[in-house]
């Protein structure tokens, strides 16, 4: 079931698993019948998970991971391999905390995943139990919509820190010497933001004040691209200012933005699941940046 979901096609999953397509189709139908839910919707392009299917797959992943741990320990006599996955918005401090987690984790066998992704995908990853924890922010602008989604997905948000907005730009930028900036100061320059796929709205934006009109907009998918565009085209982005050196560089600075808004950055987990030991270590590492 997991492979079918990952491939988005029963035919492709059958090829990957070296079994016949009819056999796999029958197996999927049998699981759906026994579970009493429709896990996949079928179409010409392949298959897609239903809402019930997403929940089913989340539990299925947990079962498979536990079986792998049992097999490694009691059959292969290997030390268990721990898995820990974080889905996060594009923050440097989440990466630094992840590095600290790995440095503190002494076992030889592990699978750690740091997934910088879109806001809605963070919620989906945690909901489907692909990720143990998700990192995102809430503000006056997005709180109502995100809170509704958290309720729908049975997730809980825990605030870690509260930050004031800062403008990130290159050290040689015409505005770099200003001690404080206003939104109107930024109008002549390209606004840089992260793409949100099918959820391009202020409610899922990683940047504050995304509804404020801008003549020049550039959207990217990763932090390295944003840094290059800040330097190459004198663009800017608005973020927390918690850790002002993107990618450990000295070319980018942050300047406080004189606007009445705050970013409440926190973590998201499933309501029915407590933080694991690795989760607690990671959260403690995040708290150091408050």
Q: Which residues does each PLM region occupy?
A:
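Short helix-boundary/capping micro-motifs
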Residues: 2-20
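Alpha-helical linker/hinge and terminal dimerization helices associated
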Residues: 34-35, 56-78, 85, 93, ...
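Central regulatory/effector-binding core of bacterial HTH transcription factors
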Residues: 81-145, 220
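Beta-alpha-beta core module
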Residues: 152-158, 163, 224-273
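Hydrophobic hinge/microswitch elements
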Residues: 127-131, 137, 196-253
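Secondary-structure junction motif
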Residues: 94-100, 141-143, 175, 183-211, ...
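A short LG(V/I)-centered, amphipathic sequence patch enriched
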Residues: 30-51
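Flexible hinge/capping segments at coil-to-helix
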Residues: 149-191
């Amino acid at each position: 079931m997991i492979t079918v979901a990952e491939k988005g096609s029963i035919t492709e999953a059958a090829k990957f698993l070296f079994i016949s397509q009819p056999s796999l189709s029958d197996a999927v139908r049998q699981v759906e019948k026994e579970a009493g839910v429709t896990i996949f919707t079928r179409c010409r392009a392949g298959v897609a998970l239903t809402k019930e299917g997403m929940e089913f797959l989340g539990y299925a992943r947990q079962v498979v991971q536990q079986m792998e741990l049992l097999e490694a320990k009691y059959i292969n006599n290997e030390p268990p391999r721990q898995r820990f996955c974080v889905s996060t918005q594009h923050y440097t401090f989440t990466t630094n905390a992840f590095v600290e987690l790995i440095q503190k984790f002494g076992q030889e066998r592990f699978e750690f995943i740091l997934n910088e992704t879109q806001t809605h995908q963070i919620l989906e990853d945690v909901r489907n139990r692909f990720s143990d924890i998700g990192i995102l922010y809430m503000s006056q602008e997005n709180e109502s919509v995100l809170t509704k989604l958290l309720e729908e997905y049975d997730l809980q948000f825990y605030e870690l820190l509260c930050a004031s907005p800062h403008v990130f730009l290159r050290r040689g930028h015409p505005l770099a010497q200003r001690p404080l900036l206003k939104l109107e100061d930024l109008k002549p320059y390209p606004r840089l933001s992260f793409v949100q796929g099918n959820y391009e709205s202020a409610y899922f934006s990683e940047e504050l004040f995304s509804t404020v009109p801008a003549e020049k907009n550039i959207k990217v998918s990763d932090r390295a691209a944003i840094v290059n565009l800040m330097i190459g085209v004198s663009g800017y982005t608005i973020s927390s200012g918690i850790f002002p050196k993107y990618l450990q560089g000295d070319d980018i600075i942050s300047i406080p933005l004189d606007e009445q808004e705050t970013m409440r950055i926190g973590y998201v987990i499933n309501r029915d699941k407590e933080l694991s030991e690795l989760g607690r270590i990671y959260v403690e590492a995040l708290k150091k940046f408050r």
